Regions:
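Conserved pre-motif C helix in the palm subdomain of viral-like polymerases
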Residues: 1-17
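Acidic/histidine-rich catalytic cores and adjacent linkers
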Residues: 4, 21, 42
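Generic non-transmembrane alpha-helical segments
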Residues: 15-24, 50-58
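Catalytic palm active-site di-aspartate
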Residues: 25-40
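C-terminal, non-catalytic extensions of nucleic-acid polymerases
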Residues: 45-230
């Protein structure tokens, strides 16, 4: 039953999208499982309303409407949109108001990306002046069968299985040590975390700032969310 309702709803959205594509100047931005987004000249907005009303009458379903001032989209599941009243909608990689069960690592990346996209803020300067070191924190974890270790200056130190860290200049290399696979029963697997970057463990917040933040990493991550968007 659930599958039939889901498929039927998606097919009906496709029907709506097909009808909207006949409107002059309209551009279909995205179609998701529960809605769609279009860009249309203001003078043709009434045609969208007409198509919407006809679709609702035909299907017996109701459509909610939201009008954006601007929308920056990486893909259908990752985008940021600003309403006409200034409020912001965030999805996927652009979210930073996390629930307790979600990974709240690297919040500075999404927060700075939003400022870049909605306020035209400079990436490097905004990151360098960011006031909260906690927003730079990342985290990784491994199951009990594995362990985390950091290598620095020829010394290897084991870390707790859930470890908080930030990308730091002069930091060590972080690795996951995973149990052997059946085809190589005697060989533990060494998997890099943030390969190519130094990290500084920070399970105790007093350790924050002992090594300088490597801003180049965070600049690169912000650029991934800001450059080349539709």
């Amino acid at each position: 039953f659930t599958m039939s309702i889901t498929l039927n709803g998606q097919l009906l959205l496709c029907l709506l999208a097909e009808g909207l594509m006949h409107i002059e100047g309209l551009r279909l931005i995205q179609v998701n499982t529960d809605g769609l987004t279009v860009r249309v000249p203001r003078q043709n907005k009434w045609l969208v309303d007409l198509a919407r009303a006809g679709w609702q009458s035909r299907t017996g379903l109701n459509l909610e409407e939201a009008i954006y001032k601007t929308m920056m989209i990486r893909d259908v599941n990752n985008y940021i949109a600003q309403y006409e009243d200034g409020n912001v909608k965030r999805k996927g990689a652009y979210e930073y108001d996390m629930d307790w069960h979600q990974n709240a690592g690297g919040l500075v990346i999404a927060k700075v990306a939003e400022k870049v996209l909605t306020e035209d803020a400079p990436i490097r300067e905004t990151l360098h002046n960011w006031p909260d070191i906690m927003d730079f924190m990342l985290r990784t974890k491994v199951p009990r069968s594995s362990h985390l270790a950091i290598e620095r200056d020829g010394v290897t130190s084991q870390l707790q299985n859930i470890t908080r860290y930030y990308i730091a200049e002069g930091g060590g290399r972080l690795f996951k040590w995973m149990p052997p696979l059946a085809k190589n029963p005697g060989q533990w697997r060494k998997i890099g975390v943030e390969s190519g970057w130094g990290v500084h463990p920070c399970n105790d917040i007093k350790d924050a700032g002992k090594l300088p933040v490597d801003f180049d990493y965070y600049i690169r991550e912000v650029e991934k969310l800001c450059l080349g968007l539709a």
